[in-house]
Every structure is written in C-alpha cells, then in structure tokens.
C-alpha cells in the first residue's frame, strides 16, 4: 500500500496553506502541510486518501498553476519529526532507495551550470520538480558545479528553461541548457573540421591525379613522337642501300655495252 505523504510540484510560490487545504478538500483528513518555494508536501491520515488525491488531482490548477501530484519518497527513520516548519532536508529519500528503484533515463536532458557544491542530486531533483516530472537527476559528476536533470516529457524540459533558468539555489544563479543543443553544437563543430580535412585531402588527391595524368600524357606523346621519327633513318638507309646496290649493276651494264661496242668495231675492221 502507498504512503500517506504526497508531493506537490510546480507549486506557485504565492500559494498558502489555506489554498492547499482548499485544493485537497474532500479527499480525507490532512495531518500535515509542508510548503517550500515552488513545491510542497501534504500528509494524509489514510493512505487511500493519498492514492485518490494523486489519481484525481494530478495536472489540476492550484493558484493558476498546473501542479503535479505524486507519491512522495519514503523518508529516513531519523526524519520523522513533524511540523509545518520542518527542516528542508527532511523530505529526502535515503540513498538505499536509489538502488532499489533505478531511475528512468530519457532524452529530455537538461544541463545545469553554476551549481553550488552544497546542492546534492536530491536537492536538484526537488527543485526541478517545479517544472514537471523529473525521472533522473545527478550533480557534480563528472564535472564539479554542473548537474544533469532528465524529464518525462519535452514540454516539462521547456517549462524548466522558461521558469527556472537564472533562479538561485543556495546563493548561486543557475544556468539551464538543453542537452541536445549542446551535443548538436559539438557534433557540428566536429563535422565541420572533418569536412574541411576531407575537402583538403580530396583537393590534394585531385591535384595529384591531374598531375599524374599530365605526366602520363606527356610521356605517351614523347613516345609517339620518337616512334614516328625512328622510321625516317630506316627509309634513308633503304634508299642508300638501294643506290649502293644499283651502282654495280650499272657498272656491269656499262662494261657489257663497252664490250659490245668493241666487238662491233672489230667486226667492222
């Protein structure tokens, strides 16, 4: 069976105990009301009344603000002291509870900067519940003075940025940044550097390819020119050899002609 203590999130800072009593009127006897800045706790005598209040009043308007109503975390044994002005840390849940119920991780992540070192993840989660349902919270890990908060919906994340950015927690004004935007900016810068390096390598490869092509073309042209010039001396050699081969024949013919002439002269005498 659920507990008797109910958490109120997104509570208007101007809300008073009378407003809270009027809001929960008709849901059973209230044992205690503990209001903080932006959130609060209501304790019923009967846990069934607390169940009904969570089921029917979650998302309703209280002092012109839609509040979130959910069961509060179990308090430690040492924090049972009652009273309307109880210590602000009495509503913390013990660390063992975190192990038993693992948090739900979502993509609706919010980065909290300039976080005081005195603020724990429990304090941060309770503070951020003013904006919506918080599924996960962590502080000072891995970076000091920085926290991470994840919401159940993107609308709660935007609501937190609009309402809680610049607010003070333990004397420090926090700065809220959407986690996806930070990741996108880093990925864009990395992609730009990668694209520039890739374009440089591509231009270099293109230059080397064009240079190799020009060199291969020049080599092919020189080879073609040398090939076209080489037959010329062969023709000249053929011409020279033919002229040389014809010269003995002409000598023989001249000799035969001279012999025939000499014979004709002798026969005439």
Swiss-Prot record:
Bias (Basic residues) ranges = 74-83, 181-226
Induction field: By insulin and hepatectomy.
What is the native source organism of this protein? Rattus norvegicus
Q: How is it modified after translation?
A: Extensively phosphorylated on serine residues in the RS domain.
What is the designated name of this protein? Answer: Serine/arginine-rich splicing factor 5
Specify residue ranges for compositional bias: Low complexity.
239-251
In this UniProt entry, the residues modified to N6-acetyllysine are 167
Fill in the subunit field for this protein.
Found in a pre-mRNA splicing complex with SRSF4/SFRS4, SRSF5/SFRS5, SNRNP70, SNRPA1, SRRM1 and SRRM2. Interacts (via RS domain) with PHF5A (via N-terminus).
Q: What is the lineage of its organism?
A: Eukaryota, Metazoa, Chordata, Craniata, Vertebrata
């Amino acid at each position: 069976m659920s507990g008797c203590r109910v958490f109120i999130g997104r509570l208007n800072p101007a809300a008073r105990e009378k407003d809270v009593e009027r809001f929960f009127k008709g849901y059973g006897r209230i044992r205690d009301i503990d209001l903080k800045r932006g959130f609060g706790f209501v304790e019923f005598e009967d846990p069934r009344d607390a169940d009904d209040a969570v089921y029917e009043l979650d998302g309703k308007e209280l002092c012109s603000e839609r509040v979130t109503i959910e069961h509060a975390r179990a308090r430690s044994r040492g924090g049972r002291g009652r009273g309307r002005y109880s210590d602000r840390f009495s509503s913390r849940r013990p660390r063992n509870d975190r192990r038993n119920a693992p948090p739900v991780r979502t993509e609706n992540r919010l980065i909290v900067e300039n976080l005081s070192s005195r603020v724990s993840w429990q304090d941060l989660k309770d503070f951020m519940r003013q904006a919506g349902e918080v599924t996960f919270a962590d502080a000072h890990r891995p970076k000091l003075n920085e926290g991470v908060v994840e919401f159940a919906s993107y609308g709660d994340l935007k609501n937190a940025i609009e309402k809680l950015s610049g607010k003070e927690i333990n004397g420090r004004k926090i700065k809220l940044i959407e986690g996806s935007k930070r990741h996108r900016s880093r990925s864009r810068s990395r992609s730009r550097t990668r694209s520039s390096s890739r374009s440089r390598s591509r231009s270099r490869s293109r230059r080397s390819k064009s240079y190799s092509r020009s060199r291969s073309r020049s080599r092919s042209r020189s080879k073609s020119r040398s090939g076209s010039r080489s037959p010329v001396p062969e023709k000249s050699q053929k011409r020279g050899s033919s002229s040389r081969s014809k010269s003995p024949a002409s000598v023989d013919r001249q000799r035969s002609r001279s012999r025939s002439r000499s014979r004709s002269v002798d026969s005439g005498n």
